[in-house]
């Protein structure tokens, strides 16, 4: 199979990368009615598989899970999750032939095998769904021409898909129809109904393309969403301990600091996050962010280039063929870092404001990272709406996983594809930050408040203007207007 994106001519590539339309609420007036009465079979019962299925069932749809015979016989975790939640479970042979919609929610590396196994069993004219287009775009999977191929991609981990639904809301979602597979013209109706059933229409839906989803998703998760948080956690913890801070305090400041700081992003973007700082600290955070851009922008652009060209996917798939040797090695190395093995902060109290006051360089890393990722995507032809969701919007959700069990939890919750890309980025970013940024830090940049300095009103005005007028802030203000019912995730205590 050839990389689908690389088979397109330049005009087709630009067209697919630029597919992005924010859909009006009225387009979801029928909810998920198009799928009611139809048999929906989900293949895979991991985080996305289970939680999307729970939401869809609660929305009135007929959901069952098709698992491999050995997974059922051995009562593996996927079987246990599905059965304990009261779902019908069967083998591919038992459930696929009568399914109207088969949704493949297995890990990326399993997609080709799943397609090979289920495609011969699917009835004429059925539909096949993905929540990530890697198999179609990067592997060039060819799907039977009578089958409609759609994507509904919630922009957060599976656990949050469920939690937001239970709160009566949802998470922003990208939907798409594969242009090579829409024989009956029903693809968009299927994707819209699926998105509505998971709660996505309550938070905002972008009509996108498989190409735009994949390229922007890979960029976001490799850089700001995971790679930057991992690199930042490691270097900031090491710096705090080297400066004589209590390791337990340092651990808590980092582990819960990302979550607390990025909660402000969810409610009011980079502007609100920066406004949580004193004027002296805001100026310092802005200056540090500009320095971080100088140090890391070339790395951000390299990741974007490798994603667009297919170099990243071919490198990762070579590791798949080698039994994930690099992935497992890097995962083990992460588990041995000082931050991951730092003591628990039992009894240590940190107020919400203290996370901002004592984490100025962390705020700077978030600001710089979001803006670099957003700018790199937009410069590559990805629309601002997609770039926003794949950078700023998802960041609080990923930070929340670190608050639960540090980097281990983040890397467990994200996909293997995201984890692999995270390691590629953080392995380069960590030494750059350690060798160039950390030696530049001053008193008050990390671990204690920024000293008050005299403020030049014009300089502060210009900084505020620069923060508020960055394109990620302008589009973010528009998109957050749709999400008026957003609930707070959490703040550290």
UniProtKB/Swiss-Prot annotation:
Q: Which residues bind Mg(2+) 2?
A: 217, 390, 394
UniProt protein name: Ketol-acid reductoisomerase (NADP(+))
Q: Name one GO molecular function term.
A: magnesium ion binding
Output the PANTHER family linked to this UniProt entry.
Answer: KETOL-ACID REDUCTOISOMERASE, MITOCHONDRIAL
Tell me, what does this protein do in biology?
A: Involved in the biosynthesis of branched-chain amino acids (BCAA). Catalyzes an alkyl-migration followed by a ketol-acid reduction of (S)-2-acetolactate (S2AL) to yield (R)-2,3-dihydroxy-isovalerate. In the isomerase reaction, S2AL is rearranged via a Mg-dependent methyl migration to produce 3-hydroxy-3-methyl-2-ketobutyrate (HMKB). In the reductase reaction, this 2-ketoacid undergoes a metal-dependent reduction by NADPH to yield (R)-2,3-dihydroxy-isovalerate.
Q: Where is the KARI N-terminal Rossmann domain?
A: 14-208
Q: Biological process GO annotation list?
A: isoleucine biosynthetic process; L-valine biosynthetic process
Residues given in the record as NADP(+) binding sites: 45-48, 68, 76, 78, 108-110, 158
Q: In which pathway does it act?
A: Amino-acid biosynthesis; L-isoleucine biosynthesis; L-isoleucine from 2-oxobutanoate: step 2/4; Amino-acid biosynthesis; L-valine biosynthesis; L-valine from pyruvate: step 2/4
Q: Which family does it belong to?
A: Belongs to the ketol-acid reductoisomerase family.
Location of the active site: 132
| GO CC field | cytosol
Read off the lineage from the record: Bacteria, Pseudomonadati, Pseudomonadota, Gammaproteobacteria, Pasteurellales
Where Mg(2+) 1 binds, per the record, is at 217, 221
Q: Has keyword rRNA processing?
A: no
Keywords assigned by UniProt, alphabetized: Amino-acid biosynthesis, Branched-chain amino acid biosynthesis, Magnesium, Metal-binding, NADP, Oxidoreductase, Repeat
Q: Into which EC class is this enzyme placed?
A: oxidoreductase
Every KARI C-terminal knotted domain range:
209-345, 346-486
Q: Which Pfam families match?
A: KARI_C (PF01450), KARI_N (PF07991)
Q: Which reaction does it catalyse?
A: (2R)-2,3-dihydroxy-3-methylbutanoate + NADP(+) = (2S)-2-acetolactate + NADPH + H(+); (2R,3R)-2,3-dihydroxy-3-methylpentanoate + NADP(+) = (S)-2-ethyl-2-hydroxy-3-oxobutanoate + NADPH + H(+)
Q: Which residues of this UniProt protein bind substrate?
A: 415
What this protein needs as a cofactor is: Mg(2+)
């Amino acid at each position: 199979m050839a990389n689908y994106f690389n088979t397109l001519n330049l005009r087709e590539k630009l067209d697919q990368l630029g597919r992005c339309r924010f859909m009006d609420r009225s387009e979801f007036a029928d909810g998920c009615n198009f799928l009611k009465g139809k048999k929906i079979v989900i293949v895979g019962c991991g985080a996305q598989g289970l939680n999307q299925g729970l939401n869809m069932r609660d929305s009135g749809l007929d959901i069952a899970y098709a698992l491999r015979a050995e997974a059922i016989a051995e009562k593996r975790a996927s079987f246990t999750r599905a059965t304990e939640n009261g779902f019908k479970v069967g083998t591919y042979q038992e459930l696929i032939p009568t399914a109207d919609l088969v949704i493949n929610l297995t890990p990326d590396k399993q997609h080709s095998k799943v397609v090979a196994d289920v495609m011969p069993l699917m009835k004429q004219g059925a539909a096949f769904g993905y929540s990530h287009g890697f198999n179609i775009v990067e592997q060039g999977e060819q799907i039977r021409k009578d089958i409609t191929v759609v994507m509904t991609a919630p922009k957060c981990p599976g656990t949050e898909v469920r939690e937001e639904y239970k709160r009566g809301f949802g998470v922003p979602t990208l939907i798409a129809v594969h242009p090579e597979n829409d024989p009956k013209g029903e693809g968009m109706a299927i994707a819209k109904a699926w998105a509505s059933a998971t709660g996505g229409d309550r938070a905002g839906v972008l009509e996108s393309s498989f190409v735009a989803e994949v390229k922007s998703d890979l960029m976001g998760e490799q850089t700001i969403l995971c790679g930057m948080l991992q690199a930042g956690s490691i270097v900031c913890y090491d710096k705090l301990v080297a400066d004589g801070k209590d390791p337990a305090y340092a651990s808590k400041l980092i582990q819960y600091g990302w979550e607390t700081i990025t909660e402000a992003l969810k409610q009011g973007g980079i502007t609100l996050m920066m406004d949580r700082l004193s004027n002296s600290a805001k100026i310092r955070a802005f200056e540090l962010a500009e320095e971080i851009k100088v140090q890391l922008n070339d790395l951000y652009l390299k990741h974007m280039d490798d994603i667009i060209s297919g170099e990243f996917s071919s490198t990762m798939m070579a590791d798949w063929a080698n039994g994930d040797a690099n992935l497992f090695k890097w995962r083990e190395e992460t588990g041995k870092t000082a931050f991951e093995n730092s003591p628990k902060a039992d009894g240590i109290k940190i107020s919400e404001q203290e996370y901002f006051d004592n984490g100025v360089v962390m705020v700077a890393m978030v600001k710089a990272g979001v803006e670099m990722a957003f700018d790199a995507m937009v410069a590559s032809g990805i629309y601002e709406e997609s770039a926003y969701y794949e950078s700023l919007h998802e960041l609080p959700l990923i930070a929340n996983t670190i608050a639960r069990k540090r980097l281990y939890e983040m890397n467990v919750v994200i996909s293997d594809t995201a984890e692999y890309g995270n390691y590629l980025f953080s392995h380069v970013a960590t030494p750059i930050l350690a060798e160039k940024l950390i030696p530049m830090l001053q008193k008050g940049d990390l671990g204690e408040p920024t000293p008050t300095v005299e403020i030049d009103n014009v300089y502060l005005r210009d900084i505020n203007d620069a923060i508020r007028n960055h394109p990620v802030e302008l589009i973010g203000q528009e998109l957050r207007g749709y999400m008026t019912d957003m609930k707070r995730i959490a703040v550290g205590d």
